[in-house]
Amino acid sequence: MKFAPITDRLAGLGAAKWAVHAEGLRRAGLGEEIILLSIGEPDLPPPASVINKAASAMRQGRTRYAHGQGEPETLIAIAKHLTNRSGFLVTPEQVLYTAGTQNGLCTALLTLVQVGDEVLVPDPYYATYEGLVAASGATFVPVETLPEDNFHVTAQAIENAITSRTKVLLLNTPSNPTGAVLSISEIDAIGEVCKRHDLWIICDEVYADMTYDAPFCSPFDRPHLRDRTLAVSSISKSHALPGFRAGWVACHQDVIPRLTLVAEAMLFGSQPFIEDALAVALNEKHPEVERLRLAFRERAETLIKSFAESKAISARMPEGGMFIMLDVRKTKLSGEEFAWQLLNQHNVSVMPGESFGNGGTGHIRIALTVESKILKDACDRIRQLAEKLIATAN
């Protein structure tokens, strides 16, 4: 019996990246007191009105097949949300409803690339991106960013990575894992490179509502880049509803029919009651959204203060999102080695930086998904391990 080549391409791209997290979960399930900072799942409650809408919609019979592109009222809500954000009109014909950001990214890639094409991705990158590109059959090409530049990708670095086979640039702003938020000038410079080489831009914007001081900018919000951009997002993070799997792709209306063909092959519609809830999430103002953003910022500041005097750990304040990358290179360990020792010796689960590409080497990623008191305790344990390692090395 033979399996399809896609399974070979995906083998080794998933489970190994999450091994520390999986072990932390296993131990927590056995009753050990593990501080889990290894996954980005908001810990604060979602807006009650969104939950109530999903429940009432189910009771009202909204459990049948939905439209392939999305329910009309849902598409209107998403289009209005994006119009209000940018100031430029977005119509429902420019929107596809998806089962979360991951499904939206997969749909976009399967629509745009094939075997032989190349997809450029700033490194570090979200852990699933390699698998998404591999599933499409295209070649994954990392583009270097530097810690001293706060992991901001440059137009020149992208230009240097382009070949005759390059088809797509996959951006993520704010970035998971780095927290980098691309500025308008950076987006415009990158966009000029993409225009010059006729590249598509897929932009993962799931943390768009979680910037701190730097304003959010999407290439889809820039009129000269809109026609080549597919903006992908969801309410998973902003509204603390990752289990709803409710998201979208926004792009030129001529692309939507192609995206819909791929989406229907995978899902053949979604859950109308979830789509109704998404419409409420975007149509109404919810204090929980701002409360979540402020909580992550306050926790990030707590973490930065915890390592301000450390000679073993370097921490940079993220510009957005719900993660911080800690530089542990002074300990002489890789991020993965440090993460395993931290779990085994101090009961704290974090993600190794190497799970996010070569650019994450010597780093660990901290999720800001626990209250500040617990986060400070975890920081104390991280600092203890790092200082012990440095003392031993000396």
Q: PLM features: residue spans?
A:
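Short beta-strand to alpha-helix junction loop
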Residues: 69-70
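Intrinsically disordered, tyrosine-centered linear signaling motifs in cytosolic regions
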Residues: 64-65, 207
